[in-house]
């Protein structure tokens, strides 16, 4: 743990020189977020998050990808407001029950562990939404990716949207245009789409998310012709026509636990796992050029990924007197 924590702290110490963000206007909101939000009210907040994320990574190498995914799935539904963390209650239908999250979203217990530690340090101060944003950044750094200053000051939602989670989060079998449209609805563009998809350099996906590529991509009983035949043969060994739905596969088979640009190199070799990955290289000229750039130039990918993460983290946050600071992330304050 000590080694991982030292790497994380060393990388984060460089953000004082980062050009990515000093103060960010939140998309869809009248409020501002800024990295120094907790400097006076909870000065150890970021240190606490970093430490717990580092400890979790030592015990579970999959956790960083899970935390990145939580932040993404949170921001794409009603904005970055920690609505994804809420359990179902009398008035709330949890987003955890949606198709994109059911049986796949994870890391909730770790977020609660971080929240508990922060409540001990500075009660009712640091929002669950900000914890998600910080944990996503720290997860990127600890696996070898870029760092950035995280704008802070989000507050937590008092409700959730199951329909929003089902409809607004891009799906593995969506067309390129559908995915781009979902990004544009959030104030993001094609560059953000390609760079943020690069988070698939770590993490896993289930057989059920890409099976159609192996056996019946276009409804004609034939596999996806943009998938390497050799790679498809390997995948079929563990992802049959039926059964094994929950079997996990690396999104980046080359360096599955390292945040790097091998994801884009895989796409050029037609070895993207998901259809939503490979179409970045096969369905749009501009996105193909970006894939080629990032495959060749990891620094360019890292720089844009950091910028796009800040941009995504600014989607419609609750600020000022809106929302609340939950004491427990899985339920609203009036529930106990």
From Swiss-Prot:
Task: State the Gene Ontology terms under molecular function.
Answer: heme binding; lactoperoxidase activity; metal ion binding
Cystines in this chain: 42-122, 75-80, 128-329, 207-239
Record keywords = Calcium, Disulfide bond, Glycoprotein, Heme, Hydrogen peroxide, Iron, Metal-binding, Oxidoreductase, Peroxidase, Secreted, Signal
Query: What's the record's note on cofactor binding?
Result: Binds 1 heme b (iron(II)-protoporphyrin IX) group per subunit.
**Where is this protein chiefly located?**
secreted
Q: Where is the signal peptide?
A: 1-23
Q: Cite the binding residues for Ca(2+) 1.
A: 74, 77, 79, 81, 83
UniProt-annotated glycosylation sites, renumbered to this chain: 173, 216
Any one GO CC term of this protein is: plant-type cell wall
Q: Which InterPro entries does the annotation name?
A: Haem_peroxidase, Haem_peroxidase_sf, Peroxidase_pln, Peroxidases_heam-ligand_BS, Secretory_peroxidase
**What catalytic activity is recorded?**
2 a phenolic donor + H2O2 = 2 a phenolic radical donor + 2 H2O
Instruction: Give the binding site residues for heme b.
Output: 200
**What is this protein's expression induced by?**
Up-regulated transiently by a cold treatment.
Domain of life of the native organism: Eukaryota
Cofactors demanded by this protein: heme b; Ca(2+)
Query: Could you say which residues are annotated as the site Transition state stabilizer?
Result: 69
Q: Does the keyword Heme apply?
A: yes
Q: What class of enzyme is it?
A: oxidoreductase
Positions the record marks as coiled coil are: none
Location of this chain's protein in the cell: Secreted
Q: What else is known?
A: There are 73 peroxidase genes in A.thaliana.
Q: Which family does it belong to?
A: Belongs to the peroxidase family. Classical plant (class III) peroxidase subfamily.
Q: What is this protein called?
A: Peroxidase 72
